[in-house]
Amino acid sequence: MMDASKELQVLHIDFLNQDNAVSHHTWEFQTSSPVFRRGQVFHLRLVLNQPLQSYHQLKLEFSTGPNPSIAKHTLVVLDPRTPSDHYNWQATLQNESGKEVTVAVTSSPNAILGKYQLNVKTGNHILKSEENILYLLFNPWCKEDMVFMPDEDERKEYILNDTGCHYVGAARSIKCKPWNFGQFEKNVLDCCISLLTESSLKPTDRRDPVLVCRAMCAMMSFEKGQGVLIGNWTGDYEGGTAPYKWTGSAPILQQYYNTKQAVCFGQCWVFAGILTTVLRALGIPARSVTGFDSAHDTERNLTVDTYVNENGEKITSMTHDSVWNFHVWTDAWMKRPDLPKGYDGWQAVDATPQERSQGVFCCGPSPLTAIRKGDIFIVYDTRFVFSEVNGDRLIWLVKMVNGQEELHVISMETTSIGKNISTKAVGQDRRRDITYEYKYPEGSSEERQVMDHAFLLLSSEREHRRPVKENFLHMSVQSDDVLLGNSVNFTVILKRKTAALQNVNILGSFELQLYTGKKMAKLCDLNKTSQIQGQVSEVTLTLDSKTYINSLAILDDEPVIRGFIIAEIVESKEIMASEVFTSFQYPEFSIELPNTGRIGQLLVCNCIFKNTLAIPLTDVKFSLESLGISSLQTSDHGTVQPGETIQSQIKCTPIKTGPKKFIVKLSSKQVKEINAQKIVLITK
């Protein structure tokens, strides 16, 4: 028997964190374990009890998941002195210096994602230590990886950028909502790896970004005792955080990781924010995407149907589809070897719980190419996403005739769904319109051909798509966004094929609602009868500010005014309808910050706001946040009267170098949020 004192033993493994982190683009992760990307070489330094001899045994064992097994690809055994290809993993000795040896390890570009234990076996001795844990991620820098992205600027944006924004508001009034993705913050990657374990994925499924993406999408929403975030669209957020108050993903994922309890509460941009963070952390290129006038087609018939009574009020018992002023989801970049050729690239993934897919609340990944072509049965959930961005919209008038309900199509819009699909531009703080990636131009022959193709695939009767009758009346409604506290004007534009003098009855029904279309308060009905002459004429309805101002303070959401307008020509009984949404505009505020700062030196942010509105603002707060600089800080300012100016100083001390984005927010009972931001370069 060999003398134990002469047996080779590994005393310590040096993961050479600094060098490996730079080459693997993982230096910013705040985690105690080394982080590597698959398909790329990394180096280890083994500290031995004696110089390595030719007769010594030396094997590296990488294991992941419960009961690791070579047959299941969850255990990889490598001998660095006998170059071999073990499931496309390789190890070679690079350098020997006394009692230290350097080993180069290259994992497979198809390796299982997640947490690995590294053990080193030397004869009868095995070095096992919880310190020798490593994380293995997808690698968009590796050509053989399914998530390979060829453009370096895009990799920097969709993998390495930890700040960004969501686009919210309305199609005519798009607003930027800054968002800290924070994929490198403490415990965020640990949370993402933990979510892989908690999901229904088998370890071998974790090789495939399609399956990982789908599983992470499902894990974002709470269901059956599992999931990160609880959705809430009621307007009552007692016991949690109102969705609009979140400014980033990291606090949500950190809270979930620390408590293992679902976080309260989220809406679409919050779900999209945390999914984008999780995918970027795991190495899947991801971007936040917003579609305006986004449809929710519950009947899965590629149309959005709204039913109204003769007063212009929505009949909720019949109307199950909805149109959201905006909806935010995530695009993820990957190859799709599970599909026919041509569907690689961006895939839509929607973490907001809307409809079940294969029994769980998740949507996608759906190839943008399939959505654009109308290939609605390409997996996953392409039919649902297609309807979100390219459905037709019908408004039905329900009339009682001799005690029976009669349905009349009073509006059919083929261009109103899926406007201004937006994402942050690569390397710039500006909006990029990517509508063309989702569909052909509205009204083009290609777009109509795609709709015909989609309906043919659906094998649906298309009675409603045939002209009901020749329309001699066409109507549109215009309304500019209004400064909070002012009256709102709705201009009804009527176009006729005759210039004859006629009488028109205009009925407008107005309500305060959430961006999802949920009614929060009935405001009023406005009626007007006018004589019109000429082929084009205008009629204006004015909504007084008193009808909406008192309802704002009771809402803990960003509201919009919905106007539903019905016009009827008295002489011909011709009826048309249109729906219009109006958002509120708010005064801006200014921030004063230096352009540069240093680690350890105090930074002071001066916030200045003048209330130029005609109403007082109550419960006014300033808040500031910056990744690596300052966690969320808030200062209270009570009530700010019309014309009054307030100032606030918020102080912080930087702890990380680089360009850092400061996000400052003002909020009140009446104004839910106004944002300002500035980038400060922090040096040593």
UniProtKB/Swiss-Prot annotation:
Name any cofactors this protein relies on.
Answer: Ca(2+)
Q: What is the uppermost EC class here? A: transferase
UniProt keywords (A-Z) are:
Acyltransferase, Calcium, Metal-binding, Transferase
Any idea of its EC number?
2.3.2.13
Q: Which domain of life is it from?
A: Eukaryota
Which family is this protein grouped under? Belongs to the transglutaminase superfamily. Transglutaminase family.
Q: What's this protein's name?
A: Protein-glutamine gamma-glutamyltransferase 4
Gene source species: Homo sapiens (Human)
Which classification does the entry list for the species? Eukaryota, Metazoa, Chordata, Craniata, Vertebrata
State which gene encodes it.
TGM4
